[in-house]
Amino acid sequence: MRIVVQRVKHASVTNDSVDNKINKGYCLLVGVGKSSTEADIATLAKKIVNARLFEDADGKLNLNLQQVEGEILSISQFTLYADVRKGNRPGFTQSMSPDCANELYEQFNDTLRSYGINVLTGEFGTDMLVDIANDGPVTIIYESQDGKII
């Protein structure tokens, strides 16, 4: 499982059936790979919720999402598993099938919510307009395999 975490001042996602917006928090771009498991969900959710990516009074990255009462906008993004080694068109054979990926994506969001975080989402498997006001910018890529951060 591969997740791009962006600290944001605000972020939104819209399409024909979704219109969600958060203020201060994280915008997550969530990729589910063929080998992603429930262990990866638990590992990454805990790591992201506890990540100290917000500045304290001294300007150090020392505060986590809960300490700043932040929110999460979670966006599914199968293109995070693009293979660009051959040719000019990316391949997506390392992305999990949509049905299975959606199930793990929903479990991931539910796990984040279990920490008391307000989590809004886009619509899985559709084209969406995502507006991100990256704060800093602070952008971190998290990846887990077999329940371990890699």
UniProtKB/Swiss-Prot annotation:
Superkingdom per UniProt: Bacteria
GO cellular component terms attached to this protein's record: cytoplasm
Motif mapping: Gly-cisPro motif, important for rejection of L-amino acids: 136-137
Single GO MF annotation: D-tyrosyl-tRNA(Tyr) deacylase activity
Alphabetic keyword roster: Cytoplasm, Hydrolase, RNA-binding, tRNA-binding
GO biological process, one term: D-amino acid catabolic process
Compartments where found: Cytoplasm
Catalytic activity: glycyl-tRNA(Ala) + H2O = tRNA(Ala) + glycine + H(+); a D-aminoacyl-tRNA + H2O = a tRNA + a D-alpha-amino acid + H(+)
UniProt xrefs under Gene3D superfamilies: D-tyrosyl-tRNA(Tyr) deacylase
One Pfam family cited in the UniProt record for this chain: Tyr_Deacylase
The keyword RNA-binding appears for this protein: yes
Enzyme Commission number(s) from the entry: 3.1.1.96
Coiled-coil ranges (or none): none
Record's subunit section: Homodimer.
Family statement: Belongs to the DTD family.
Domain comment quoted from the record: A Gly-cisPro motif from one monomer fits into the active site of the other monomer to allow specific chiral rejection of L-amino acids.
Job description of the protein: An aminoacyl-tRNA editing enzyme that deacylates mischarged D-aminoacyl-tRNAs. Also deacylates mischarged glycyl-tRNA(Ala), protecting cells against glycine mischarging by AlaRS. Acts via tRNA-based rather than protein-based catalysis; rejects L-amino acids rather than detecting D-amino acids in the active site. By recycling D-aminoacyl-tRNA to D-amino acids and free tRNA molecules, this enzyme counteracts the toxicity associated with the formation of D-aminoacyl-tRNA entities in vivo and helps enforce protein L-homochirality.
Protein name listed in UniProt: D-aminoacyl-tRNA deacylase
UniProt source species: Staphylococcus saprophyticus subsp. saprophyticus (strain ATCC 15305 / DSM 20229 / NCIMB 8711 / NCTC 7292 / S-41)
